[in-house]
């Protein structure tokens, strides 16, 4: 982890994630699955800080967000039990990781150690290290240097920050449906942050996890039980380019087998129940079009800068009054230089007929960088100004079978200019909820000024606008409260000439 930071606010990562009931419950289970997949990779790579952040995010999602969904009460009991058991494993691992994370931070920045302020803040239960300044580190728990404080993320747009008004984790346990009212000593014992914050003296765990990087391997993801079906019809898979980032073999999340943890786990298990969700707004699910396609000509391993647009760069905006709650940029995303041309060849027939074509982008995570290693062409229905996948479950099954992260979508504008329509931003909203790094690529072959664009919704501005919009079809959107744009051109995306990708045609 050769990185730097100005402020580490790990506790902020556990801030409550609000529920959008237009999005199906199974989608939230997939978000949980993706968080655990990232945690597995960070664990295998011995990246304890990002691992800690991912586990905190999962605990918040499992304790608060998922049980608050309006469909949770009627969901399968097996899914609830699976979630509860994974949560127990995660909470146990978090307790063990606290001293390891503190030690790692001290090792990385020994000269800055006197400047840390490692303590639990009584007002909000957060834990912060202040003013440890080093340049240009993009991490979930490391704020960008020299950025003004940023707005709070309305959803999952930032890895290091969720909602401002988050109660302490102890308070979250009190809100759960528990079998008994634990005393303060018990609450302190089971707090994720612990009675003494990260500086508390727990014995660090010993991991036997090994990591290898073969050139080409398929491995199964952590999957919610109800989504374990395989694809019935075999998709056509072709090789799209040359080199591929090696995929790590990762071990699943490990629950402690030590006897000292047995009583802790049993007591914590008795406290956890998901039967008291908070009241939520009963909005109907709004079905927006599924993932679409794009083109690009960029130099080797340089940021994929699109031609000038009025939107500023695709960065998470930072303007929070509280310095400890700054948000961070997404991780780097690498795209094969030839991928957009490959997609346009696949879309050629539709483009000639003035019909849009869409594709889904998926890939892998290695050394804190995402790589798009698969271009999935789903069964779809198209018009001159829209494109919608017709079998979303088939797409999910392909991603799960190959342990791929959902990294966005690509689609054509056969005769229109290069921009994100109102339908496009609604489509991309679900991708960016799933993963902040997800991008929307628009291919506009008839646009002489820019024939492609790589976009993300702004956070929190654009994400909040779309989250609060219940309209369908083409319509106007109001500007975000901060006066900024709804979406931006991305600048953390790199075109990689050595990256290999597969084309998976499901049509």
From Swiss-Prot:
Q: Which domain of life is it from?
A: Eukaryota
Q: Write down how the cofactor binds this protein.
A: Binds 2 Zn(2+) ions per subunit.
Annotated EC: 3.4.19.-
Q: Which Pfam families match?
A: JAB, USP8_dimer
* Topological category with respect to the lipid bilayer: Peripheral membrane protein
Which residues are Zn(2+) 1-binding? 411, 413, 424
The entry's keywords: Cytoplasm, Hydrolase, Membrane, Metal-binding, Metalloprotease, Protease, Ubl conjugation pathway, Zinc
- Please indicate the residue ranges that the annotation assigns to the motif JAMM motif: 411-424
Q: Where is the MPN domain?
A: 333-463
According to UniProt, residues marked as the site described as Indirect zinc-binding are 356
**The UniProt record lists the keyword Membrane:** yes
| Principal location class | membrane
CDD domains xrefs: MPN_AMSH_like
Classification via InterPro entries: JAMM/MPN+_dom, MPN, STAMBP/STALP-like_MPN, USP8_dimer
Give its localization. Answer: Membrane; Cytoplasm
GO CC, alphabetical: cytoplasm; membrane
Cofactor requirements of the protein:
Zn(2+)
Q: Tell me, what is an example of a GO biological process annotation in this record?
A: proteolysis
Q: What class of enzyme is it?
A: hydrolase
Keyword check for tRNA processing, yes or no.
no
Domain annotation text? Answer: The JAMM motif is essential for the protease activity.
Recorded family membership: Belongs to the peptidase M67C family.
**Function (record text):** Zinc metalloprotease that cleaves 'Lys-48'- and 'Lys-63'-linked polyubiquitin chains.
- Name of the protein this chain belongs to: AMSH-like ubiquitin thioesterase 1
Native organism is Arabidopsis thaliana (Mouse-ear cress)
């Amino acid at each position: 982890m050769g990185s730097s930071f100005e402020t580490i606010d790990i506790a902020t990562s556990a801030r409550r994630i609000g529920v959008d009931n237009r999005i199906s419950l199974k989608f939230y289970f997939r978000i949980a699955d993706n968080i655990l997949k990232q945690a597995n990779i960070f664990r295998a790579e011995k990246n304890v800080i990002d691992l800690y952040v991912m586990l905190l995010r999962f605990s918040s999602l499992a304790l608060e967000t998922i049980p608050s969904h309006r469909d949770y009460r009627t969901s399968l009991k097996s899914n609830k039990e699976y979630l509860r058991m994974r949560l127990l494993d995660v909470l146990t691992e978090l307790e063990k990781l606290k001293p390891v994370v503190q030690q790692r931070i001290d090792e990385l920045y020994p000269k800055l150690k006197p400047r840390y302020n490692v303590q639990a803040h009584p007002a909000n239960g957060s834990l912060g290290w202040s003013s440890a300044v080093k340049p240009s580190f993009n991490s979930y728990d490391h704020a960008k240097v020299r950025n003004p404080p940023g707005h709070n993320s309305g959803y999952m747009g930032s890895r290091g920050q969720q909602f401002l008004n988050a109660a302490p984790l102890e308070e979250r346990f009190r809100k759960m449906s528990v079998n008994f009212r634990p005393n303060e000593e018990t609450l302190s014992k089971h707090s994720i942050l612990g009675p003494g914050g990260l500086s508390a003296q727990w014995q660090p765990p010993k991991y036997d996890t090994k990591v290898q990087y073969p050139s080409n391997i398929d491995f199964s993801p952590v999957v919610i039980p109800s989504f374990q079906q395989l694809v019935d019809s075999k998709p056509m898979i072709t090789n799209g380019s040359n080199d591929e980032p090696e995929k790590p073999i990762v071990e699943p999340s490990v629950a402690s087998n030590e006897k000292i943890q047995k009583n802790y786990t049993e007591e914590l298990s008795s406290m956890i129940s998901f039967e008291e969700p908070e009241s939520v707004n009963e909005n109907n699910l709004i079905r927006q079009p599924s993932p679409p396609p794009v083109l690009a000509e960029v130099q080797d391993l340089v940021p994929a800068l699109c031609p000038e647009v009025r939107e500023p760069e695709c960065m998470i905006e930072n303007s929070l009054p509280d310095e400890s709650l700054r948000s961070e940029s997404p991780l780097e995303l690498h795209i094969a230089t030839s991928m957009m041309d490959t997609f346009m060849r696949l879309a050629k027939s539709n483009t000639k007929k003035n019909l849009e074509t869409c594709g889904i982008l998926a890939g892998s995570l290695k050394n804190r960088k995402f790589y798009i290693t698969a271009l999935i062409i789903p069964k779809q229905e198209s018009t001159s100004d829209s494109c919608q996948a017709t079998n979303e479950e088939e797409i999910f099954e392909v991603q799960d079978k190959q342990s791929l992260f959902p990294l966005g979508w690509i689609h054509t504008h056969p005769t229109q200019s290069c921009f994100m329509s109102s339908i496009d931003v609604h489509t991309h909203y679900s991708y960016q909820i799933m993963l902040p790094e997800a991008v929307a690529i628009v291919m506009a072959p008839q646009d002489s000024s820019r024939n492609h664009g790589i976009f993300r919704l702004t956070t929190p501005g654009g994400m909040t606008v779309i989250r609060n919009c219940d309209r369908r079809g083409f319509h106007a959107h109001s500007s975000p409260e901060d006066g900024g744009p709804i979406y931006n051109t991305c600048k953390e995306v790199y075109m990689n000439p050595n990256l290999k990708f597969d084309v998976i045609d499901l049509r």
